[in-house]
A protein has these predicted regions:
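Small-residue-biased structural context
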Residues: 2-167
Length: 167
């Protein structure tokens, strides 16, 4: 019997949003869901049409990471904490990907989106979940970006990543 391939079967593996990606902070989770949606949009876009979608994704990721870093600084993390360093490394790599795409490697955006889809769950479940728990513990409202009690923030700055698995 001959079976036909449907378009869904030829679409790249998309990154599903699952409850396991929730961090416990509604605003962070909303931003993360947008991040996942944009990865899926890239993977569903033909390679020759990906650059504008990727540029929008890069801009979103810059703001996504800046948002988390504002929260870190507002709640006692040092500016050079390892969570922010992870963000900087990802953004540097994403910028290099754009340059390679323009220099004729039309598959690199797809490869980057696939790599981010693999990386992101671990990051969300460790560093971001740790940050969300920290924000909650100090009474930080991520919607208003305010502290219920500013005295809850200690004078000592944290240099770790916010994860229970990072010092």
């Amino acid at each position: 019997m001959h079976t036909m391939t449907t378009p869904a079967e030829t679409t790249p593996n998309l990154m599903p949003w699952t409850d396991s990606l929730n961090t416990g902070d509604a605003r962070m989770d909303e931003t993360h869901q947008e991040f996942v949606d944009m990865i899926n949009t890239i993977l569903a876009t033909p390679e020759e049409e990906q650059l504008p979608v990727y540029k929008a994704f890069l801009n979103h990721t810059v703001e996504h990471f800046a948002q988390e870093e504002r929260w870190m600084l507002a709640t006692g993390f040092s500016a050079d904490n390892c969570h922010a360093e992870h963000h900087a490394t990802i953004l540097e790599t994403m910028r290099v990907v754009e340059a390679h795409y323009l220099d004729t490697d039309k598959q690199i955006i797809t490869r980057m989106a696939e790599a981010l889809a693999e990386w992101f769950p671990g990051h969300a479940n460790s560093m971001d979940a740790g940050l969300a728990a920290h924000l909650q513990s100090v009474g930080f409202d991520s919607v208003t970006e305010t502290l219920a009690d500013p005295s809850a923030i200690k004078n000592v700055t944290m240099s770790g990543c916010g994860s229970v698995s990072c010092s």
